[in-house]
C-alpha cells in the first residue's frame, strides 16, 4: 500500500478562507460577486481563472508539471517501503510539523442526555494533507473493510442508543426523537472520541474499505467514514486557506437533485455549483467562483477525480433517504450558464471513470423496477413469482437464467418451523404475559424476561444480539404494533431465490436491508436428538441451529469507546440448543442462503409462541447495511472446504 501527496508548495501565498455554503438550501447573499455578462457567460470563468493565476506566484517547476501532466500527482515516484513519495523537484514534499496526537476523551453515559451540559475539548481539525492510497492488496483491503464495518457498527449502535434514551425519557407514547438529529449527535460524539476514519488525512480517490455500491442513511455517516467531509455542503474540498499553494481542491460531491439545473444521466452528470438558493430551494441570485465552485474548477484543471455519492429518496425504517457511493468521476468540463430561474450558475460535466463496479444507484433503481414490473427489465429467467404460494406476506421470486434447474419448486414451502407434536400443549400451562395495553415499556414483564431491556428499537431493529429473545406471545395484552413483536410478523422484505454459478442457489433482497433488520425465519422440520440420530444414519443431511456462528456481531451495541462508564450487559445462560432441522422435503427461502465465513446475516434465537428453551425459533437479521441484489450469506459453523449450504440445495 502506498500514499502519494498532492504537490502543494508552502511558499505560495494562500488565498482568503472560503467557507462552503449549505447545500441544497443556503442563505441569500447580499452582494453579488459579478454582473451577469450580456454576451458569453463562459467568459466569466476564463477571466476568474486568469486573474487567479496572475495573482499566484507559481514556480517554473510547478508550472511545467501542471501544464504537461495536467495532474496534481507527480509522475516520478520514489518508493520507500509502502509509501510513495513524490519527486522533490515538483515541490511536492512539504515539511509538516509533528503535533502530538490528542488523547481520546470518552463521554460518560449521562453526557448523552441533552439536559447535561458537558465542556468538551475542541475536536482535532481535519488534516490539510492530500494523499491517494495506492497498491492496496486483497489482505489489506480485507482489513480496511473490517475496520469500516466496526466503525459503522459503533455509529449505528450509538445512534440507536441515543434514540432509545430519549424514548425512555419521553415514555411510552411520547414524542419520538428525530432520526437525523440523533444521527448528527452520534457523529459528533464519535468525532470527539477520535473515531472518525481518515481524519488525519484527506484522501483523493477511493477510500480503502469503502466499496462502490455501499449504502448509508445519513450524511453524518459519510463524514464518519471519511467518504465526504461535510454534513451539509454538497462539495467537499480543501480550502485555499489550508492549501499550501492557495488553491482549493475538491475531493467529493453529493448529487441529490437539490439544484434545479442538475442533469443526472448516470455515467454523465451535469453538476450545478453551490450557492445562490433561497430557503425554498430556488435559485435566487448568481453563483460565484469561490469555495466549492472554485475547488471543482481546480480539480478539473489538475485532472483530480472526485468521489460521487448520490442521495436518493427511499422510504425505509431508518430514514427517508439513502446515500449510495457510486465511485470515481472526472470533471471534464466547466462553464458558466444562465439557469432555469434566470440567474448565473456554474456547471460541471462529470464523467464516470471506466472499469469500476456497477453503480449502486443503478442497482437500486433496477431492484425497484423488479418489485413492480420484473418482466420489463428481465424478460427471461423468471420461473415463478411466488414459491411460497401465498404463505408469506410478500411474494418470493425464483430466477434462473443459467440452466433449466427448477429444484426449489419441488419442495413444500414452510413459512415457520414445524416443532414436535405436543410441544405447545405442554407449555400452555406455563404461559405468562404482560398487561401492557399500549405496548411494552419500562417495568414490563416481557422487559424483565429480556434481562431488563427490550431487544428492539421502535423501528423493529435489533439493538444487540442476545443468547435468547423473549417476544410477546398470545398471553400478552399488548397490541400487534408492540415493538416486542418483530419476528412473529413474518417476512416483510422482498426476497429472490436465484441460480448462481458460485453457490448453486442463492438468495438476495430486492429491498435495502439496514443493519439489525429482521429478514426471515430459518424454517424446517424440528427434530429431537433421537430423531436426528436416526436420520443421520440414513445419510440425510440436517441443519443444526447450534452450529450457526455470529461471532462477528458480538460487538454490536458495545459503546465502551464512546461512553467511558458503559458496561456491557450480561445475560443468563440458556440450555444448549440441541435440536436439528430436516429440510429435505419442507423448507423456506432461508434454506437457500449460502455459507460464508464473512457473512452479512446473523442468527438470533427467539421465543414467542411457546416457552421451551430447548426449541427456540431460528431468526435471521442483517448484520450490516445490505444493498439490493447483494447475495445473503450465513456462517453455518462448518469448515471452509465443506460443501456450500450444507449440500441442502444441490
UniProtKB/Swiss-Prot annotation:
Primary localization: nucleus
Domain named YDG: residues: 205-352
GO cellular component, one term: chromosome, centromeric region
Compartments in which it is found: Nucleus; Chromosome, Centromere
SUPFAM superfamilies (UniProt xref): PUA domain-like (SSF88697), SET domain (SSF82199)
Positions that bind Zn(2+) 1: 434, 436, 440, 444
GO molecular function: DNA binding; histone methyltransferase activity; zinc ion binding
Keyword list, A-Z: Centromere, Chromatin regulator, Chromosome, DNA-binding, Metal-binding, Nucleus, Zinc
CDD domains in the cross-refs: SET_AtSUVH-like (cd10545)
Domain (SET): residue spans on this chain: 493-637
Extent of Polar residues compositional bias: 107-118
Keyword presence, Cytoplasm: no
Biased composition (Low complexity): 7-20
Family: Belongs to the class V-like SAM-binding methyltransferase superfamily. Histone-lysine methyltransferase family. Suvar3-9 subfamily.
Entry's free-text remark on domains: Although both SET and pre-SET domains are present, the absence of the post-SET domain may explain the lack of methyltransferase activity. Besides, the Cys residues in the SET domain that normally bind a zinc ion are not conserved.
Described purpose of this protein according to its UniProt entry: Histone methyltransferase family member that plays a role in gene silencing. Together with MORC6 and SUVH2, regulates the silencing of some transposable elements (TEs). According to PubMed:19043555, the protein does not bind S-adenosyl-L-methionine and lacks methyltransferase activity. Instead, it may function downstream of DRM2 in RNA-directed DNA methylation, binding to methylated DNA and recruiting DNA-directed RNA polymerase V to chromatin.
Name of the protein in its database record: Histone-lysine N-methyltransferase family member SUVH9
Upper taxonomic lineage: Eukaryota, Viridiplantae, Streptophyta, Embryophyta, Tracheophyta
